[in-house]
């Protein structure tokens, strides 16, 4: 079986009996994404598909399996997980299976020509200067050409069974994020990562408190106490409950830092992103930084530690204890 940190792109390697890992390249950090083949009663389930790159050698990949791929399961609608769904389906002849909420958001983002305009306006309302907002959107939407998601997939919900695996709701990194659990094994997508932590951001049409959702997800995983979690990037998480506690502590610290950035003067998500992540970020990283700052600001509002102010000019936040003045 392969060592956790060893991978060669497009090679299919066994990580434990009945589970094989496929690692595909990404043009930006973390430079790779892991997909998984799960052996079942009628063939293999492919979990996630990488980007929709024409150079992905699906015939060579599939030739390494001792049986057909009978379904393709998508953990979430981010480009590096759903982007290759259509090419993978064409190569295998297998149906694509995706969560209902996740597919709805996938269609609104990657299937909607007005999405760049909508998210640009949203960033501007959160304090991003107009010229910077355009730059952020252009940098992030470069992936759109490589997102070939499957229209009208088979829709599933948390609690459904998929060839012996239970579908688990794991929102946070994406609202509709799903994982697969069987016995003491969790195929986690981007819910649990090591040594990095999953990005938890607020975006247009997000659920109102994605960080709160994610903290609840961590509690549920820790309570279930799986032996191992196979992640979408990096090494397998060998002590998932411990890793859940570490990530929760990381966000508690970031919440404290976010709270300390607030006072009586209204500050936007763009402002606070500089306190949390510094000023020297390329546009695509600033996009994530603003979204991450906003998820923490909204969590502080839910916890009564910050106040949210919104009018026709935009959205800003103050410390709850300061009282604050109108934006």
Named regions from a protein language model:
Residues 9-67, 179-194:
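Conserved beta-strand hairpin/beta-sheet module of binuclear metal-dependent hydrolase folds
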Residues 75-81, 99, 171-173, 177, ...:
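Histidine-centered divalent metal-coordination motifs
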Residues 90, 170, 301:
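Short, contiguous alpha-helical
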Residues 1-6, 257-327:
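C-terminal regulatory/interaction regions
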Residues 16-23, 138-145, 163-165:
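Short Pro/Gly-enriched beta-strand edge/turn motifs at strand-loop
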Residues 44-53, 140-151, 166-255:
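Metallo-beta-lactamase
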Residues 59-157:
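Active-site HxH/HxHxD metal-binding segment of metal-dependent hydrolases
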Residues 58, 82, 214, 293:
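Aromatic/hydrophobic pocket-lining residues that form the small-molecule binding cavity
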């Amino acid at each position: 079986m392969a060592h956790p940190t060893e991978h060669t792109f497009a090679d299919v390697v066994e990580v434990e009996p009945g589970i094989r890992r496929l690692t595909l390249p990404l043009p930006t950090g973390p430079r790779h994404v892991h997909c998984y083949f799960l052996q079942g009663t009628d063939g293999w389930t492919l979990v996630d598909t990488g980007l929709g790159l024409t150079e992905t050698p699906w015939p060579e990949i599939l030739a390494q399996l001792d049986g057909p791929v009978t379904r393709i399961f998508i953990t979430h609608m981010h480009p590096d997980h759903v982007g290759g769904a259509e090419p993978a389906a064409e190569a295998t002849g297998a149906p694509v299976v995706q969560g209902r909420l996740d597919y709805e958001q996938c269609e609104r983002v990657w299937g909607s020509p007005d999405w760049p305009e909508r998210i640009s306006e949203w960033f501007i309302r959160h304090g991003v200067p107009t010229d910077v907002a355009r730059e952020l959107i252009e940098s992030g939407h470069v992936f759109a050409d490589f997102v070939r998601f499957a229209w009208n997939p088979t829709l599933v919900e948390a609690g459904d069974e998929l060839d012996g695996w239970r579908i688990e709701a794991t929102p946070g990194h994406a609202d509709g994020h799903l994982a697969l659990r069987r016995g003491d094994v969790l195929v986690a997508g981007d819910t649990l990562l090591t040594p990095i932590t999953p990005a938890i951001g607020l975006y247009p049409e997000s659920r109102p408190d994605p960080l709160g959702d994610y903290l609840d997800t961590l509690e549920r995983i820790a309570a279930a106490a799986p032996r191992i979690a196979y992640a979408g990037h990096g090494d397998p998480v060998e002590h998932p409950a411990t890793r859940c506690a570490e990530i929760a502590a990381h966000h508690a610290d970031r919440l404290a830092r976010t709270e300390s950035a607030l006072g009586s003067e209204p500050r936007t998500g763009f402002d606070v992103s500089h306190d949390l992540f510094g000023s020297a970020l390329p546009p695509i990283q600033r996009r994530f930084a603003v979204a991450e700052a906003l998820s923490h600001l909204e969590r502080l509002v839910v916890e009564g530690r910050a106040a949210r102010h919104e009018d026709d000019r935009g959205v800003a936040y103050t410390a709850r204890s300061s009282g604050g003045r109108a934006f």
